[in-house]
Amino acid sequence: MIYNFVPRYLVMTGIAAGTDSGKMNYGDVVVATTAWDYRAGKDVREEERSEHINTIKPFTIETSFINWVRELSKDEESLRKISDDFQGKKPETKLKLLHGSVVSGASVVTDEEIVKGILKEQSRDILALEMEIYGVYYAANWAIKPRPKFVAIKSISDFADAHKMDDFHQYASYTSAKVFEKLAKDYFDYDF
């Protein structure tokens, strides 16, 4: 698709699982400044136990995106309006826009011990887990020039634990899309 359409921007929106319910809430938006596949590497067996040895190969978005997100994250009025305009079920928390590392994997995680293991073994600063961002970043990074600028904007719909529910999926999808809309209208450069 990148080869055929040669987009200037490649943006992914959607939902993700947060890693820390004490620092983020349902619907909070996470911009993946860095992403990698948390299962990349190799599995080895040593005596009586198996171990996964990670090979972390992250992709990072352009600095301009990071600066735009930092600026928008301070715009409490815009974030409040995004939340207030949603007509469905939503949490009673203030919407936040976060940015940082997000990891991708091939399966849905509903086990907080897996999340704790990823945070311990790879980076305690990972904000979210999901299944697609790394693939998008990989494709954009290795595209034939001109490469698109790429960014993923996902919102927290659960915390990858046994309490996984769908109550806030619509709200999370909405906040993700609305933050993208705000960035696209107010920050993206369309001069070709």
Regions found by a protein language model. Name each.
Residues 1-192:
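Intrinsic-disorder/coil detector with helix-boundary
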